[in-house]
A protein has these predicted regions:
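Residues within mature, well-folded domains
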Residues: 1-130
């Protein structure tokens, strides 16, 4: 579904770019979507675009796995955003200290660590990036 695909490009595009990609009929939107992903395709001589497939696989995973009571679309949560942009972390550590649940996501190759804490009703907030 082209509408769905374009809608979920919000982490990669500016508002202006998203508006532009959203304009036109379905065929034009599809052409714009493919044009965006073509230079990002790691194997441009094949019909399958691995980068595009991976991005939407992450959106799908985040949608279902990071839902909260307040946000049914888990890709829009803070953990969902990090997952969509960086993929699955190399390690996840959960801890409970002083009544606060913390989840630490480590990305070794990127040398990045994201620390989330539950702030209320199971909602994780990004507290720190190292």
């Amino acid at each position: 579904n082209v509408e769905f695909a374009v809608k979920y490009m919000y982490y990669l595009l500016t508002d202006e770019q998203l508006d532009e990609m959203s304009s036109g009929n379905e065929a034009k939107k599809f052409a714009k979507l493919l044009a965006y992903w073509k230079p990002r395709d790691p194997t441009p001589n094949t019909p399958y675009n691995e980068a595009m497939a991976e991005y939407f696989r992450r959106i799908d995973y985040a949608f279902f796995n990071f839902q909260t009571i307040r946000e049914r679309d888990g890709s829009k949560t803070e953990r969902g955003k990090i997952y969509v942009l960086y993929g699955p972390p190399d390690s996840i550590e959960s801890s409970l200290a002083n009544g606060t649940t913390t989840e630490t996501w480590k990305y070794s190759k990127l040398n990045k660590t994201f620390i989330f804490s539950i702030v209320s009703n199971g909602i994780y907030k990004l507290m720190e990036i190292q």
